[in-house]
């Protein structure tokens, strides 16, 4: 089972809130509209949207809640918006187009690895919304940010929504066992299954209780400062915006350095081996 199939299965089992037609998904969409409405007042966004047209690239978009919300906010300001959505899940790609159409947003969508997204050209806004960074290990994150920076127009802006996951775990402790979906008809849980010291990933088994189907996925936890400082390697200026939700932030970046391109980041020896070298 490749990573796209594992993600399909993981989202199916845990039923994370990326379905825009569910009550939880509608709530997320309304929250995103409000969030981006306020973000549009940031000086970097004000400068960027002073023209009459803007292009958006939504990386790891899921079913498009974040990208469609951002597009709607900018369209309501009178801008012509072109939205490009990419995700590794085939079902999410299909649903994102359906959702965008329902909301009157002009969109294209591709099943594609976000690390390869720079091949699609350059955009005014590159968005990473929701839990996308949790799917990228410590070696994949620089590749993701290199791709985002390379896909950015010279005066463009990168927008990353993320939790300060290290702070959350430090304050509340790491949980071995989590109820992912409490609904009786779709009850699912996750259980800690190990740790990969090379990639910095915590492995979790996601289990659907009614048939005990299991998929193992890596999860990655970072602080907001780590995300911001890593993005800074690829973009000259960085800002952090606090949202109304506790421990949830928007990290902004602008002015691509273009010194380190995605194709320069070849796998190092330790990642190829998959484990530390043992001198014993």
Q: Locations of the language-model features?
A:
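Conserved class I S-adenosyl-L-methionine
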Residues: 1-53
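Conserved beta-strand elements of the Class I
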Residues: 55-57
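Class I SAM-dependent methyltransferase "Motif I" SAM/SAH-binding loop
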Residues: 60-64
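Class I SAM-dependent methyltransferase SAM/SAH-binding core
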Residues: 67-116
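A short SAM/SAH-binding and catalytic strip from SAM-dependent methyltransferases
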Residues: 124-140
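A short glycine-rich, Lys/Arg-flanked "PGG" loop and its adjoining helix->strand segment in the class I
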Residues: 142-154
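SAM-dependent methyltransferase
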Residues: 160-228
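C-terminal lobe and adjacent flexible extensions of AdoMet/dcAdoMet transferase-like proteins
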Residues: 233-280
């Amino acid at each position: 089972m490749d990573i796209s199939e594992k993600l399909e299965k993981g989202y199916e089992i845990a039923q994370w809130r990326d379905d825009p037609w569910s009550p939880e998904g509608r709530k997320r969409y309304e929250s995103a509209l409000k969030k981006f409405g306020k973000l549009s007042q940031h000086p970097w966004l004000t400068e960027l949207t002073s023209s009459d047209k803007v292009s958006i690239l939504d990386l790891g978009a899921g079913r498009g809640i974040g990208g469609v919300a951002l597009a709607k906010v900018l369209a309501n300001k009178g801008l012509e918006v072109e939205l490009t959505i990419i995700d590794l899940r085939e079902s999410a790609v299909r649903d994102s187009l359906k959702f965008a159409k329902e909301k009157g947003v002009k969109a294209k969508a591709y099943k594609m690895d976000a690390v390869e997204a720079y091949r699609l050209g350059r955009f005014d806004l590159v968005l990473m919304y929701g839990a996308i960074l949790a799917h990228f290990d410590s070696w994949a994150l620089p590749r993701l940010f290199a791709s985002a920076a390379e896909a950015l127009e010279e005066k463009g802006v990168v927008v990353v929504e993320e939790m300060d996951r290290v702070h959350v775990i430090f304050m509340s402790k790491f949980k071995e066992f989590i109820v992912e979906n409490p609904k009786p008809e779709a009850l699912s849980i996750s259980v800690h299954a190990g740790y990969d010291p090379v990639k910095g990933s915590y492995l979790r088994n996601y289990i659907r209780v009614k048939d005990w189907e299991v998929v193992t996925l890596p999860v990655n936890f970072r602080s907001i400062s780590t995300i911001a400082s890593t993005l800074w390697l690829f973009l000259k200026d960085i800002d952090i915006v606090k949202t109304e939700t506790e421990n949830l932030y928007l990290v902004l970046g602008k002015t691509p350095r273009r010194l380190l391109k995605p194709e320069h980041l070849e796998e190092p020896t330790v990642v190829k081996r998959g484990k530390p070298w043992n001198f014993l």
